[in-house]
């Protein structure tokens, strides 16, 4: 059985796929240059015709090139599904087809693509209920052993006072700035980077013009004692920041109160902004949280995710 990944381009996504190679026969679907050129040509011609031109035959060519079989699995993500010829590849794949929805989407999108897949999963529990899709735990890009090795190279001072935030504005800057001020008053060293976007109204000293590559983001994370995350409106699932906290032995200041419901919750590791009392912030910064169990960490590894996808095919 081969497992194909289609549209997984981000650096941390490729790291996840690489970590699976020891236990699974994983492949990345590569679209040949000539297929992309033909697709662009036919798409241009199609704009001049009264009906769209069927391009599923190009998807079949790509699948045949990779030697897919009925027992194989195709794993797609929602962010790249409608780009280029990806939907045509998914629709003509002969094996078990899975869509992982990692960002917030609407019912119109889900209804338009549901028929292409055997199973649709989301990392966000509220989105699962709203859109009638299956819940899947967020995955961390690295195995427990690889994360431990990365953490051992951490440049963190271990003082509990180095705090980092990195993310697009997305209307969250007011909350991020309030958190920054509260941490500054506690004598924390701040490494905050708010990436400007269309929601940015007034730039602060923490605003930057471009997002950092994942390796740089990872370096910042490893060098911090406390990670800061502010969830988007409507977002209830866990982000990579929660998993970085667990795997790298960090602390997290977050707006996501759902972590209090988890077995891994420790008030010495998690501070819930807007829920926990500001008076408890010094205690949080000074606390020594309980180590996270290996069983808990494994639940969020790529291997655990893939074991479930294989079992449910």
Residue locations for each model-derived region?
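Catalytic core of nucleotide-activated saccharide and alditol-phosphate transferases
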Residues: 80-184, 308
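Alpha-helix C-terminal capping/helix-to-coil transition sites in glycosyltransferase folds
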Residues: 70, 116, 222-223
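N-terminal pre-catalytic "stem/leader" segment of glycosyltransferase-like enzymes
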Residues: 1-96, 102, 119, 259, ...
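Catalytic binding pocket for nucleotide-activated donors in carbohydrate/polymer assembly enzymes
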Residues: 202-209, 214-310
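Active-site regions of enzymes building and remodeling cell-envelope glycoconjugates
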Residues: 23-30, 41-46, 95-97, 116-122, ...
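Short, polar loop motifs at secondary-structure junctions
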Residues: 10-12, 104-108, 121-129, 194-200, ...
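Structural alpha-helical scaffold elements that stabilize or flank donor/cofactor-binding regions
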Residues: 67, 113, 219-220
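Catalytic donor nucleotide-activated moiety binding site of glycosyltransferases and closely related
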Residues: 32-35, 174-211, 215, 257
